[in-house]
A protein has these predicted regions:
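A cross-family phosphate/adenosyl-ligand binding-site feature
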Residues: 45-46, 50-53
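Active-site-adjacent pocket-lining segments in enzyme domains
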Residues: 3-19, 23-36, 40, 53-176
Length: 176
């Protein structure tokens, strides 16, 4: 039976990256729920298209057992993460990442996802594909120059342009 996925979308989110996951999951019968990493469910894509997520990240806390995997969909909100790290939704993001990792769930993402996984303290010894600009900031995991990397329960792609390179492995793992 296919697994259920919690998809985290920052505000703004890269629509190209987000919709690669959502469409692949839909086409393969994989259930998902989109959570806005924001104060409200209303978010935008980097290009300004308005979206309404299923819920906000605060409401995912305590429901980690309802899901088998987590996707972090990166976007233009991430380069300013440090300036907003103390916002409740970003504090919740770190909590959710730690909770999913602590339960051994699949952690999937692109661009700076590996960096945020690293910030959460959950990447010790893991190889990660991260955006070249984020690579120097990775301290616990091992940032690579690869387009995508699968290492244990971590599935990371360097950018939205390379999500497709790991999608066959992601879909296979989610269909087990």
């Amino acid at each position: 039976m296919a697994k259920k996925v919690a998809v985290l979308a920052v505000n703004p989110v890269n629509g190209f990256g987000l919709f690669q996951y959502l469409e692949a999951f839909f086409e393969n019968g994989i259930s998902y729920k989109v959570y806005a990493v924001a104060e409200t469910k209303e978010i935008k894509t980097n290009s300004g298209i308005e979206l309404v997520a299923d819920d906000v990240i605060a409401n995912l806390i305590g429901h980690e057992d309802d899901f088998d995997a987590l996707v972090f969909a990166c976007g233009d909100a991430v380069p300013v993460f440090a300036q907003n790290a103390d916002k409740p939704y970003n504090v919740d993001l770190m909590s959710v990442l730690k909770a999913f990792a602590g339960k051994g769930k699949l952690l999937i993402g692109h661009c700076a996802a590996g960096l945020l996984f690293d910030f959460a303290g959950i990447t010790e010894g893991k190889r990660l594909a991260v955006h070249p600009l984020a690579k120097p900031a990775v301290s616990k995991g091992m940032a690579t120059d690869e387009k995508s990397v699968v290492d244990g329960n971590f599935y990371t792609a360097q950018s939205e342009n390379f999500v497709w390179t790991m999608m066959p492995q992601v879909i296979e793992a989610l269909k087990k």
